[in-house]
Amino acid sequence: LPEEIAVPRAWSVTFYLLAVIFVLLFLYHQFILPKPKNDVPVKNGNPLNAFFQTFITFFQKKGIIAALAFILLFRFAESQLVKIASPFLLDNPEIGGLGLSTMQVGTIYGVVGLIALTIGGILGGILMAKNGLKHWIWWMTAAMNLPNLVYVYLAFTHPSNIWLISSAVAIEQFGYGFGFTALTYFMMLFSKGPL
C-alpha cells in the first residue's frame, strides 16, 4: 500500500483493535469477575461538596506553590522537544531534517522508543524503591534532560544510518522513562492524604 493509505489504515486498525479489547474487558468485568458480597456503594453526603473539598484541601497543603512549580517545570525541556522531534525526523535534509518516512519514524518511536521508555521507567522504579526520591532526584533530573543532546548531535551530523538514529531516540526515551519516575513518585508522595 502507498504510505498515504497505509498510515491512516494502520491507525484505524489500531483503534478498532483497542475497541474490541475494551469491549472484551468490559464484558469480563461485568459478567465474569467475581463480586464480593460487601461490595456496596458508599454514600458520603453531597458528592459535589466532597469534590470541591478535595480541591480546597489539596491547595492548602504546605509547599503547594513549590510543588506545582516542580510538577510543571520538571519535564519542561522534554515537552518542548517532543513537539519538534517528529518534524525534525520527517523533514527533508535540505531544510535541516533527517528525511525519514512516516513509517520509519513510527517504527522508531513505536517500537524502539517504547521499549527504551519502558525499560527506563522500570529501572527507575526499582532504583527509587531501593534508595528513595531524595537519593535519585538529581540523577533522574539529569537523565530526563541530558539525553536530549542526542538531537543536537543528529542535527549537526545528519546521519542517514537508521540504526544510529534509532539508538539516539532509544537513549533519549530511556532517559525520559528513567527521569519521569521521579516526577511520578513525587506526585504520589505529595498528593497522598490531607494537609
Q: What are the roles of these predicted feature ranges?
A:
Residues 134-183, 187:
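C-terminal transmembrane helical hairpin of 12-TM major facilitator-type secondary transporters
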Residues 13-17, 105, 136:
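Alpha-helical transmembrane segments of multi-pass secondary-active solute transporters
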Residues 73-85, 176, 180:
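Conserved extracellular-gate-facing transmembrane-helix segments in secondary transporters
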Residues 1-80, 129:
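Intracellular loop-helix junctions on the cytosolic face of multi-pass helical membrane proteins
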Residues 11, 98-110, 161, 165:
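Juxtamembrane helix-start elements in MFS-like secondary transporters
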Residues 118-138:
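Helix-to-loop junctions at the C-terminal end of transmembrane segments
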Residues 74, 83-107:
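Short amphipathic helix-loop junctions that connect adjacent transmembrane helices
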Residues 187-195:
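Paired intracellular helix-loop junctions of major facilitator superfamily
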